[in-house]
Amino acid sequence: MFMMFAMTSDSVGEIIKEVKIEFAVTNTQASLMHSLFMIGIAFSGLFLGFLADKFGRKKTLILGLALFAISCYLFMVGSTFAFILSLVTLSGLAVGVFKTAALALIGDISRSTKEHTGTMNGAEAFFGVGAIIGPILVAWLITQGVHWTWLYVIAGGLCTVLICMALMVEYPQSKAIKEKPTSLVDSLKLLKDPYALGFSIGAFLYVAAESAIYVWMPSYLICDANSASDMYSCYANESTQTLAIYAVSVFFALRAVGRFVGIWMMQHYEWTKVLLLFSFMIMLCFLVGLIAGPMLAVFLFPLSGIFMSVIYPTFNSKGISCFEKRQHGSVAGVILFFTAAGAAAGPFIMGVVSDAYGGDAKYGFVVATGFSILLFLGLLYNAIVQPTRERLAMIEKREYGVDSTTAS
């Protein structure tokens, strides 16, 4: 499921290049392909996240998958930029529904907050695999003369298979959900909770920086956008040119590998220290890549994927684990809202800033570097103050029956 979702969402950098040519739109307009998708997820996460708590994980999951499949199949009849954008928005709404249900389900099957974090990294690792497959598949379709919208048709087919599988699987039922069903009002109240808000802001900053890589890195690394033969001619040798062409796929590959490693890592190391170290390395990659330019960024920007790998799954896991299981769908929706808001706002702001300075993507990466600096500062505070230690320990004992003085 996570892999199927990533095939479309993380291929947007490659798709934007095609959309700009096909519909003759600007960077700002083309970035709506990403921004509206994320706005759909954000709206759905905040206002529909409670569905997984109110009606159960299975029903909500199937509803979201069905909406996503329909939106994907409709890409075959889309012929205008406005219609394509409407489908992108609908698919985002669908993702928000099924992803909050899936995230809540992880809490139902976990036996501790530590196991929850490991499982979350595993699920997001498959997202990473989909993020590798998607851009490669788009590139292959285009070279074969097949329209890029077939990526969505393929995703719709996978989604249909997932619906059939979901119908046959028995899901664990949380007793708390039956006794205390959550409403939209309860979900919105979480916006005032410092734990939900803290992890949500962290997710916003992280995703704003991460999406800069897969949305705008292809544009940043291009030498001459006006000539296909000279597009990567500024790089010293053929191997570096090849890396520039496949930089997004390399980034996603490193991120996926890092998340599989993260399953083990989060079982053996203090999560606050791991996130602090990795956020520092992300900031360093952005700063040096921006200052040195594409010649060095072609190595550093993809490399940042290994350091980004465990941050978002851990934010998600620890944020959700700060609450009772009956609220997991709602809090997952709140975090997803800020996640999608960051993914929508980050690249859009970068596109606007780039257009304001003549269309050069490097000016947009100044914004992305700022996000990475704020992320590091937030995780530095988290590592020093440890604001969630007591809350996680309390939930560990109450919800999972594990008595511990600390939660890692």
Language-model-detected regions and their locations in the chain:
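Extracytoplasmic
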Residues: 1-21, 25, 99, 103, ...
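Residue-level signature of mid-helix packing/kink "hotspots" within the transmembrane helices
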Residues: 10, 38-46, 132, 252-260, ...
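Extracytoplasmic gate region of multi-pass secondary transporters
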Residues: 12-13, 194-249, 256
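Helix-breaking motifs and short loop linkers at transmembrane-helix boundaries and internal kinks
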Residues: 24, 56, 77-82, 270, ...
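Conserved MFS/SLC helix-loop-helix module at the cytosolic interface between two early adjacent transmembrane helices
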Residues: 43-82
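Helix-loop-helix hairpin linking two adjacent transmembrane segments in secondary transporters
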Residues: 83, 122-170
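Cytoplasmic helix-loop-helix junction between adjacent transmembrane helices
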Residues: 87-126
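Symmetry-related core transmembrane helices of the 12-TM Major Facilitator Superfamily/SLC fold
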Residues: 149-167, 363-382
